Amino acid sequence: MKVVPSEKIKPNWWRETSVYQIYPASFKDSNGDGFGDLEGIISKVDYLKALNVESIWLCPIYPSPLKDMGYDVSDYKQIDSRYGTLEDLDRLMKALHERDMKLVMDLVLNHTSDQHEWFKESRSSKTNPKRDWYFWKPARYNEKGERLPPNNWRSYFDTSAWEWDEATQEYYLHLWSVGQPDLNWETPKVREAVHDILRFWLDRGVDGFRLDAINMISKDQRFLDAPITDDRYEYQLAYQYYANGPRIHEYLNGIGNILTEYDAFSVGEMPYVLDTNEILHVVGADRRELTMIFQFDFVDLDLDPNQHKYIEGSWELSDLKKSLKKWQSALLSGGGWNASFIENHDQTRTVSRYLSDSPKYRAYSSKLMALFIIFQSGTPFVFQGQELALANIPRDWPIDEYLDVETQNFWKLFMSGNPSQEEIEKTMDIVNKRARDNGRTPMHWDSSPNGGFTKAGVKPWMRVTNDYKEWNAANQVNDPESPYTFWSKALELRKELKDAVVYGSFELISEEDPSIVAFVRESSTYKLIILLNFTGNKVSYDCPLNLTSYEILLDNYKDFICMTSPVTLNPYQAVLLKL
């Protein structure tokens, strides 16, 4: 069924833009310390402009102890010296704005670092004025008199979500690491401080924000025990109590009112939201909350039913189609807006995870994902290296090369159970497939030592993957057949055909086909068909539309023939057609 856009969807720059996500530590090191920096990003602005992306999202670059690579912020109004200075950020902003590009900052508002002055004050005494800026609770005790956390919530890093503070004899809440205490948004002064941070950056010229874990800021104040859904663990995921809590829309409206004043972009990270109506309450055109959100249906397709990433799950193409239809239909017709993504700093490389990173099909797979992401309704997000078909960490790397706190905490917990060698190998297979580290390895700029990320002889903060000599930017930017060129052309066509791609209708066709994802984007000016073979097999496809009069705009094999059905699609073939 064709889904027609709601009349509430009006032209706006953030609907028409495309966003390139930069993980600064791994993008480009300019000074030879092995750590990416703002000067390195500035040196690659023209590379990004040529890719045809129009907005740049920077992962956190604020001062931080780096317990969670910058998502533990110790000062919201400064730049970490590893990355540069406020003046360097101003120069980056100037370089982008001169090229009609935008800058989006990453704001972490659910929690701070335990080194933030707010938390230092809060933990200093029970009577400190900032004590209620965080969640502090007394201990529970079992029948043996042993001290227990206030409830059984598990952090995202597989420990208790509560940490004991010896000095004040209470626990504080941390949904992430012990170094990331959760802010208490119930306290009005916390909200005032957050609003001040937003205005600080907007007044400086920033064009918008990605808001980390933003649906965690309102929590059920009863702090009930979570149901036991995974009996392997003492502590349990409790998202029903800390995600999308009772005051979430009040808090988001406070943020949205400020963003609206500046016509600013906002995308909220909102895991555990499956109800499209709940999302429309956030991103509806008349809601004044956020402009779009990241929902996780696509990237959670292969998780087990309890959403534990290190248990092997499975997925079918029909699952992806159901999700695509659900979100495209609900938000387009309901006056909301999608953020179209499948890779980021918390996910793995899609050529490895969902398609094929074999030498034969890797480039084709990357190009397929370009059409899938870019031609949906919504604002497309490209993660650094995705345009180069970068793949996951090699399977033979030892666990010591995986530096992420999530991976290390999981492995420590797993090994504490004295697993067999067979269990270790099987679990390592899953870690290699799912670990966040996969998206965080340094960029491949050229075939020089360290892939051009940093100088020869310098040890980068994280190891560069082995295949940088074959898969790098220098090899691709001038190659008309490369993944980079294909992504660039697709992004350029999105701009040229915005009547259909940005503001047109959406229709999923051939819903029962087990191999092909096919959809139509249409306006009064254009009719586009996107055909994607998600399998490693050559497929005969019976298209319900007569393709004989269509023009081929993009084809990752350059051999598609517009003819009456059935048509043939090669393994991982992706075709964009225009009537």
Curated annotation (Swiss-Prot):
GO molecular function, one term: alpha-amylase activity
Site (Transition state stabilizer): 346
Annotated keywords: Glycosidase, Hydrolase, Maltose metabolism
Keyword Hydrolase tagged: yes
Entry's induction text: Repressed by glucose and inositol.
Superkingdom assignment: Eukaryota
GO CC annotation, single: cytosol
Reactions it catalyzes: Hydrolysis of terminal, non-reducing (1->4)-linked alpha-D-glucose residues with release of alpha-D-glucose
EC number: 3.2.1.20
Active site: 212, 269
Cross-referenced InterPro entries: Glyco_hydro_13_cat_dom, Glyco_hydro_b, Glycoside_hydrolase_SF, O16G_dom_2
Coiled-coil zones: none
Gene Ontology biological process terms, A to Z: maltose catabolic process; polysaccharide catabolic process; sucrose catabolic process
Family: Belongs to the glycosyl hydrolase 13 family.
The protein's name in its UniProt record: Alpha-glucosidase
Species of provenance: Schizosaccharomyces pombe (strain 972 / ATCC 24843)
